[in-house]
C-alpha cells in the first residue's frame, strides 16, 4: 500500500499576540494531532525547501518580493497582512508557499497529497493580504504551468 504524502515543516509556526485571531501554532498543533493517530503510520512526511526568488516572481512583483527579502514592509503593508512582522513569519512564508507546490507535485505523481501549512491564497501580486504574505495557489499554478 502506498503512503499518503504529507508536506510539513516545523518552522511553519509564527509568534502572534495571545488574543490575535490567527493561531500561530495551528500548523504544529495539527501535525502533532496527526502524529498521535494510529493512521499516521500510513503517512510519508516531506519537508519543503525555501521558495526561490525566480519562482516567486512568477506570482509576485519584484518590488514586493524584495520587500519580503529585505524585511522592509511599510506599516500599510503590514496592516493589510494583519500579522505582526517577524523573521519567523518571513521564513515560514518562503517555506509554506513551496510546501503547497510540493504537495501539488506529489498529488500529480501519486494521486493525492496534503499540505499541513497551505491556504495562504489571499495575497495579491503586489502585496500581502488577510494573513497571507504570498499566494500559494497562484505560485503553485504558475510554476506548474511554467515547468510543464
State where each predicted segment sits.
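HDAC/HDAC-like amidohydrolase catalytic core signature
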Residues: 1-148
